[in-house]
């Protein structure tokens, strides 16, 4: 092969490789943005006490670890629906320190963040809690769903 032909083939190869990596990178950014948006929508439904919408973000095979232990989606739906049905209300939800990791295949993700929740209890008492939440999400049939959640108290920050 002559030098011009080698250079032309090399240029085509580099161009194809560049386009491939740009597309892969754009997919990761898009997946990360989709997960961030899902987390915002799910927590907005939580804040609004909109249980049907809130639970729509969870996969049927969902499991979670709360301070009280492990449970599945039917148990969580029953417990949380009862809690809200008794007159308790989430008043405010603020997310911070969101960190999203997308798996190599683009259909798995972990979202971890601090969640500040203000709740008005049925007796009128208002509670403010800060917790650490980590959600594992799978993209199935084109939709992201939370398949696992871990929720625990955030360490108390020291005031200086």
Tell where the protein language model's regions lie, with residue ranges.
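A solvent-exposed, acidic/Ser-Thr-rich amphipathic alpha-helical stretch
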Residues: 33-36, 51-107, 112-114, 127-129, ...
């Amino acid at each position: 092969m002559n030098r011009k032909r080698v250079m032309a083939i090399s240029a085509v190869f580099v161009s194809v490789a560049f386009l491939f990596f740009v597309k892969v990178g754009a997919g990761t950014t898009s997946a990360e943005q989709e997960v961030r948006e899902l987390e915002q929508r799910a927590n907005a439904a939580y804040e609004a006490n909109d249980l049907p919408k809130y639970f729509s973000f969870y996969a049927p095979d969902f499991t979670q670890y709360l301070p009280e232990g492990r449970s599945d989606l039917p148990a969580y739906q029953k417990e949380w629906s009862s809690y809200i049905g008794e007159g308790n209300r989430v008043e405010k939800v603020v997310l911070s320190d969101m960190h999203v990791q997308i798996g190599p295949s683009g259909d798995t993700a972990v979202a971890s963040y601090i969640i500040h929740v203000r709740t008005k209890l049925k007796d009128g008492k208002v509670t403010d809690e800060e917790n650490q939440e980590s959600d594992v999400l799978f993209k199935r049939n084109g939709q992201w769903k939370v398949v696992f959640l871990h929720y625990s108290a955030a360490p108390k920050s020291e005031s200086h």
